[in-house]
Amino acid sequence: MGGYIKKPEDIEKRSFEIITEELGEKIKKFTEEELPIVKRVIHTTADFEYADLIEFLEDPISSAKEVLSGGCKIYCDTNMIVNGLSKNILKKFNCIPYTLVSDAGVSKEAKARGVTRSIVGMEHAGKDKETKIFLIGNAPTALYKLKEMIEKNEIEKPALVVGVPVGFVGAKESKDVFKDTKVPYITINGRKGGSTVAVSILHGILYQIYKREGF
């Protein structure tokens, strides 16, 4: 039992070495900025199919880096995303992740209107001008609502939308139709995704800035 790797940094290093080895020629599909994100998603899920499913549209990484470096609010459609993000790194850039799905007022309004809390939460978050990034890992209705608000010019164009809701009802469809918005967008095509995937995508961007700034 003494031969296994014990140090967390060594475990992570070896994990990424394995990912690089097993990706093989697929590495060439991605840019220098995209590849760390792809690897981090695979590291989180242990699923190499994500290398075929992930899609980057409208230069999302550069757009995200600009607003993250200057500080912004990040709306998340689940508490799991908020809790999973690195608060230490976000704090260095004055970035604040938050969600409204558990807000009492949002819950009350959603019940009265007969819609999901994700819809109401997105309506409120979209009107906050400091919110530049949207991470959607659970609710297709949140992604549909965000698309609707963008197309009606009810909100400013986001700097980044990570649209990776998971599931069987509306997940694939919402991700597909959101591409029409021409907003900086990272998505996982098909049914796969989830809150942990949303977290890994933003971390893949954040760590690039973190290293660049020499922290």
What are these regions (language model features)?
Residues 1-32:
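Charged, compositionally biased N-terminal leader segments and the immediate start
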Residues 14-22, 40, 63-67, 84, ...:
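Alpha-helical scaffold segments in soluble metabolic enzymes
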Residues 28-43:
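N-terminal glycine-rich anion-binding loops that anchor highly charged ligand groups
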Residues 44-52, 107-108:
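Short, basic, glycine/proline-bearing loop/turn elements
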Residues 51-67:
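A short, well-structured juxtamembrane/interface segment
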Residues 78-152, 158-159, 166-167, 171, ...:
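Conserved mixed alpha/beta catalytic, RNA-binding, or beta-rich assembly cores of soluble enzyme
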Residues 155, 169-215:
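C-terminal functional extensions of proteins
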